[in-house]
């Protein structure tokens, strides 16, 4: 946990409960435990008390990791204060919150904003401002993050079910034109029990609608190209996706933003940054899904033959992730189905071949090499 902020044991201490109230004092939220320490916020599991009833929720407290030297809190329960560049920081904070809530509403509600909302996302809203920080609340049901679930015993079948559910969610976001940007076990919520379990995505802090940033340079003047590159350079969400760091698209953006920030802000560098942003796609979320799949199967209990076979497939998937990437949900699903086939029918063909070759190897006597050298002489 960061120096100067809340210590985890203090949050869990019943005598030092950290409680938030809304502006009217009618609603109260008690923070229970920290579930993630992300790039721009702390996420807490909390209890929301409203109209005499209590419910589980997730609360995000804005606190950017890269600026922790200027975001301070003296002790538990006190507000965060910004020690310098306060006006600028609050403006950035407000922009980030508006972007996150806008993305959440776009993927949560149906087109007509009726009661037919998404089964894959929780509704988020601004709860309150407290000191120099803002708090977003996500309504949830009883459950845990996938990160917590992974501490328990996992069967390979349950791992498969989680991955398939995650692919459905990514496909849902992709169909709406969104990239989540931070898919990881801490941002995946599991509710329900056994066959009734379902999965939802948390935290849209780095989510983006691709059309909001991708531009057609053929329709822009030189000045407009520089203006577009400047907007991309200043936008914190572009290239900051923590779990997607390493994907081809995110690496390209980070590199081109870094080059464009130098004093040599040439036309060519502006074009290169715009092109990198234009190349963002569902592949960058699928990159994270492959990482989650690897973590899940690493924790699963299975036979050694199954583990060897699945690791063979996962290794191929990781190599593809680092080279060409996966460009559609269907493409990644095909490789996951190979793992399902292994679990249902036995070992992967590559593992069977290796075992066959091992069984065909001859055991040579220790003095075989010496005898061979003598024969040559």
Please state what every model-predicted region is.
Residues 174-192:
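Catalytic-loop of the protein kinase fold
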Residues 344-377:
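Regulatory extensions appended to serine/threonine kinase catalytic cores
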Residues 42-102:
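ATP-binding glycine-rich loop module of kinase domains
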Residues 112-134:
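Short beta-strand micro-motifs within the conserved protein kinase catalytic domain, predominantly
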Residues 192-254, 258:
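Activation segment/activation loop of eukaryotic-type protein kinase catalytic domains
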